Amino acid sequence: ATAGQVIKCKAAVAWEAGKPLSLEEVEVAPPRAGEVRIKVVATGVCHTDAYTLSGSDPEGAFPVILGHEGAGLVESVGEGVTKFKAGDTVIPLYVPQCGECKFCKNPKTNLCQKIRVTQGRGLMPDNTSRFTCKGKQLFHFMGTSTFSEYTVVADISLANVDPKAPLDKVCLLGCGISTGYGAALNTAKVEPGSTCAVFGLGAVGLAAIMGCKVAGATRIIGVDINPEKFGKAAEFGATECLNPKDHARPVQEVLVEMTDGGVDYSFECIGNVEIMRSALEACHKGWGESVIIGVAGAGQEIATRPFQLVTGRVWKATAFGGWKSVESVPKLVEDYMNKKLKVDEFVTHTLPFDSINEGFDLMHAGKSIRCVLTF
């Protein structure tokens, strides 16, 4: 009944950087050609949302509807959309997969570039927005904008998933879990019997630990300055945990000593350029690989001595865990449904959508792994 009409609904609007989100009634325009309008059922709160809200994101544009870790149901589709219909169960994707650009055709990357420019501007592929509030246009975020009861996404930024999947859980496969898990499996390609170190034990770090374990790593060292996170890390497969604050010398030196020369694989799940250096330098000479997952602030640069690389260490990074999104997310949902992949264990808090600012507070306080908001 709502197809083709503007929908008025609730959304959390970020009017400006550094201020709490404001619950507002917004207007969501119908989907145009190649677009899909979704009724969002659940959305996670991720550090990336807070990063943009803080003003550190070079692409951050305000006012905006944030959120990029959601799941919902298709409300209506725009002209020419064939892969989705009203009622489909879907997960929006901030890394699309058009299947046609040279990036999609190359097995070495998952970074589809079809709508990259407009997505970076906070707009739909035709360079306009579908959101208004109080007469003002609002920007989209990461091509998803899940902090709204209804959102509009490009049809290439959407995965069709099992309708039996609980959306208040699988929404997390839209970012954090898939990212950390894929970093271990796809980007590092962790080998059986290896030793790994994971820096930062939030949702992404725990997912990286889970990936290392699935890949057969025998020693997985969790590193965090908050020892309250060590119990959960052990549940996910960490064989030991290390608090850099317990040591006077740099953490990489401690790790190199603990592991007889360094780890085979390390993962930086924080977004701190100093820790990125520590993670690389904790790697074993000759073959150690470090994967950067965390997003650093605008203008920050990484540093190490070239000698670290000349002597056989590899520095790489990943976006969305290297998964080609449209084809991979439905499989990840299936793995979860078949109990091959943990998701429920990441959800520490489930709150009504109106409590979104409380969700951000829990995250900043280190009290939540993932907080899911339900509409």
UniProtKB/Swiss-Prot annotation:
- What GO molecular function terms would the record report? alcohol dehydrogenase (NAD+) activity; S-(hydroxymethyl)glutathione dehydrogenase (NAD+) activity; S-(hydroxymethyl)glutathione dehydrogenase (NADP+) activity; zinc ion binding
Annotated PANTHER family: ALCOHOL DEHYDROGENASE (PTHR43880), S-(HYDROXYMETHYL)GLUTATHIONE DEHYDROGENASE (PTHR43880:SF21)
Q: Which residues bind Zn(2+) 1?
A: 46, 68, 175
Q: What is its EC number?
A: 1.1.1.1, 1.1.1.-, 1.1.1.284
**Which cofactors are required for activity?**
Zn(2+)
SMART domains of this UniProt entry? PKS_ER
Cross-referenced InterPro entries: ADH-like_C (IPR013149), ADH-like_N (IPR013154), ADH_3 (IPR014183), ADH_Zn_CS (IPR002328), GroES-like_sf (IPR011032), NAD(P)-bd_dom_sf (IPR036291), PKS_ER (IPR020843)
Quaternary structure annotation from Swiss-Prot or TrEMBL = Homodimer or heterodimer with L chain.
Q: Which cysteines are joined by disulfide bonds?
A: none
Catalyzes what? a primary alcohol + NAD(+) = an aldehyde + NADH + H(+); a secondary alcohol + NAD(+) = a ketone + NADH + H(+); S-(hydroxymethyl)glutathione + NADP(+) = S-formylglutathione + NADPH + H(+); S-(hydroxymethyl)glutathione + NAD(+) = S-formylglutathione + NADH + H(+)
The residues annotated as site (Important for FDH activity and activation by fatty acids) are 116
In which compartments does the protein localize?
Answer: Cytoplasm
Q: What class of enzyme is it?
A: oxidoreductase
What protein am I looking at? Alcohol dehydrogenase class-3 chain H
* Keywords, in A-Z order: Acetylation, Cytoplasm, Metal-binding, NAD, Oxidoreductase, Zinc
List every position bearing N-acetylalanine: 1
* Single Gene Ontology BP annotation: formaldehyde catabolic process
